[in-house]
């Protein structure tokens, strides 16, 4: 596939919690703007019972036409139980059950199982290691016998111990390993270490017991290691590796092992991470791949209680594999942040959130982090014309085409009261976006007989600011008029918001200078009120405005966006705008309003999620 092509993903939700975590996490592709084509397929226990095939032929056809596979989870049972659950008609055909994951690994020749393990919650002793397990050979290669085949009887006859045991009372499994299979595995492990910056590759085996096959493996490992002189290579007994993974996981880099040893160590690694609910995996071959969380189908886990983190991290691995490392990292960071905050975590992490709750929290964090084109820090003194220039602060650029209704919904989603009640535009069609420069007026105890030049502050206001004046809502005297308007225009001030009255209305309107106010009155405030404070916090109708907070105003009214919450509000505003545009399009195409709202998650429009599945 070309780098610009969408990733064609065969999505196989599977069994049990696999269905739930898949459904809950897939919106992250859209939130992160990843070009994907998702096509759903059938796999798992239900299809074994109904059709006698855990992976139906139609699913293999789907996989063949896809770039990769995303698997939720599958239920797998021993051969006897598998056959017992078939219908009588299927029992007559005597199908042979093979776990779907084994079928995928062998059918697609996915020789490397990759299990990253890293510290998520506790950073006091950080670790980052990866277990790479051989998938196609070793003790899981499929040569597993009971009763023993006659070809093995002669081998038993050579052992004095086994001569005394009847052949029909023994079973065996062969640990078959090939030079080519081990060579490609070890080469993959060292390359992975180089790509991820891990300085050490450890072969976990049991050469002190499996002397012949262990020596065979050792020679191939050491030969491969010579091609990677910058990587430390060592061989340890697998039981020692398990011990030291628990005691000192930070000492390891890449751990490579044959099939069964790697399987066991992978679950040890998941435990070190914090549980199977956090453990992702990838299965990689020369020409294919599939990705799945480690946790399995979780038949004992209650509905909507499973931890979706492993699936999010699995999707992160998929994105990294297909050339989207930045977006992959955003998912990892979002998962870590949600777990750190502990507000929306599932029961296995000590919380009470549902699968959906935690997934939505991770997706929302991803939406915030996906502001790669947005500035990380906002400078309240922008450099160019706010509305017109392409060089205005990037965060504010995102709001140019938005309206106050959309931003108000975003503020509500953030739990922020931002609307300045009763303040309206002096002229229709005006819009303001910019940082607040605050002025506070207070009434004089006694009306003066002379003007006191209370508005000379305007000479110090930085260009592109929005002047916010609190005159306590008074409409019996004004604090803004013609002279201030012309000075503001000369100084490139973006607009004025007055909690009180203004005058010289005709002149102001003729200049197209944006003014928003409570009312209109002709009497000056110069001898009735005085400037008490400048660049101070204001409180207008219960809303606090701090210097540098963002003011957004249009025909609907005036909003205040706290500067420290700007990025969050921008992300949610854009998502809300996207959601409402989708709903409008759906209605224009014949959908009912109720259906369109359901399809596009209108109960949480700030996520910007398309909940419709593509058929």
Curated annotation (Swiss-Prot):
One term of GO molecular function: NAD binding
Top-rank taxon, per record: Bacteria
Alphabetical list of Pfam families matching this protein: Iso_dh, RraA-like
UniProt record, GO biological process: isocitrate metabolic process; tricarboxylic acid cycle
PROSITE patterns, per database record: IDH_IMDH
Keywords: NADP, Oxidoreductase
InterPro entries reported in the protein's UniProt record: IsoCit/isopropylmalate_DH_CS, IsoPropMal-DH-like_dom, RraA/RraA-like, RraA/RraA-like_sf
Similarity remark: Belongs to the isocitrate and isopropylmalate dehydrogenases family. To M.jannaschii MJ0644 in the C-terminal section.
Name of the featured protein: Protein DlpA
């Amino acid at each position: 596939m070309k780098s610009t092509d969408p990733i064609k993903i065969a999505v196989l939700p599977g069994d049990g919690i696999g269905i739930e975590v898949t459904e809950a996490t897939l919106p992250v592709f859209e939130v992160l703007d990843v070009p994907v084509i998702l096509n759903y397929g059938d796999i798992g226990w239900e299809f074994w019972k109904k059709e006698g095939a855990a992976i139906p032929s139609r699913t293999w056809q789907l996989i063949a036409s896809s770039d990769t596979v995303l698997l939720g989870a599958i239920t797998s049972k021993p051969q006897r139980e598998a056959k017992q659950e078939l219908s009588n008609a299927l029992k007559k055909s005597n199908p042979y059950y093979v776990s779907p994951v084994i079928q995928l690994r062998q059918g697609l020749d996915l020789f490397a199982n990759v299990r990253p393990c890293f510290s998520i919650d506790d950073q006091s002793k950080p670790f980052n290691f990866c277990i790479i397990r051989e998938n196609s050979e070793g003790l899981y290669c499929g040569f597993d016998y009971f009763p023993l085949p006659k070809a093995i009887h002669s081998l038993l006859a050579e052992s004095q111990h086994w001569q005394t045991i009847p052949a029909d009372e023994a079973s065996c499994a062969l640990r078959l390993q090939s030079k080519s299979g081990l060579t490609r595995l070890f080469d993959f492990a060292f390359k992975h270490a180089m790509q991820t910056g891990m300085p050490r590759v450890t072969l976990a085996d049991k050469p002190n017991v499996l002397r012949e096959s262990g020596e065979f493996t050792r020679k191939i490992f050491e030969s491969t290691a010579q091609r990677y002189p910058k990587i430390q290579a060592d061989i340890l007994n697998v039981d020692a590796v398990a011990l030291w993974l628990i005691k000192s996981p930070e000492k390891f880099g890449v751990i490579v092992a044959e099939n069964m040893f790697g399987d066991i160590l992978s679950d040890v690694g998941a435990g070190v991470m914090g549980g199977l609910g956090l453990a992702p995996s990838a299965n990689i071959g020369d020409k294919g791949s599939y990705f799945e969380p480690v946790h399995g189908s979780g038949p004992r886990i209650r509905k909507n209680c499973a931890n979706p983190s492993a699936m999010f991290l699995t999707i992160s691995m998929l994105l990294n594999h297909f050339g989207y490392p930045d977006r992959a990292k955003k998912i990892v960071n979002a998962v870590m942040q949600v777990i750190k905050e502990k507000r929306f975590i599932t029961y296995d992490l000590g919380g009470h959130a549902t699968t959906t709750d935690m997934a939505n929290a991770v997706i929302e964090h991803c939406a915030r982090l996906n502001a790669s084109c947005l500035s990380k820090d906002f400078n309240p003194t922008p450099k160019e014309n706010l509305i017109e220039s392409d060089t205005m602060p990037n965060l504010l650029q995102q709001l140019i085409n938005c309206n106050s209704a959309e931003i108000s919904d975003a503020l509500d989603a953030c739990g922020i009261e931002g609307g300045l009640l009763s303040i309206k535009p002096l002229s229709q069609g005006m819009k303001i976006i910019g940082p607040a420069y605050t002025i506070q007026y207070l009434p004089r105890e006694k009306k003066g007989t002379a003007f006191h030049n209370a508005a000379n502050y305007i000479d110090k206001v930085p260009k592109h600011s929005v002047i916010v004046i609190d005159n306590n809502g008074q409409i019996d005297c004004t604090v803004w008029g013609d002279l201030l308007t012309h000075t503001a225009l000369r100084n490139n001030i973006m607009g004025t918001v007055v909690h009180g009255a203004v005058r010289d209305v005709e002149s102001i309107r003729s200049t197209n200078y944006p003014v928003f106010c409570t009312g209109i009155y002709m009497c000056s405030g110069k001898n009735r009120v005085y400037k008490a404070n400048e660049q101070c916090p204001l409180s207008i109708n219960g809303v606090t405005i701090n210097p540098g907070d963002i003011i957004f105003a249009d025909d609907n009214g005036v909003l205040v966006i706290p500067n420290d919450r700007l990025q969050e509000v921008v992300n949610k505003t854009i998502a809300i705008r996207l959601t409402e545009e989708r709903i409008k399009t759906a209605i224009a195409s014949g959908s009912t309003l109720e259906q369109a709202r359901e399809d596009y998650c209108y109960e949480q429009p700030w996520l910007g999620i398309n909940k419709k599945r593509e058929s």
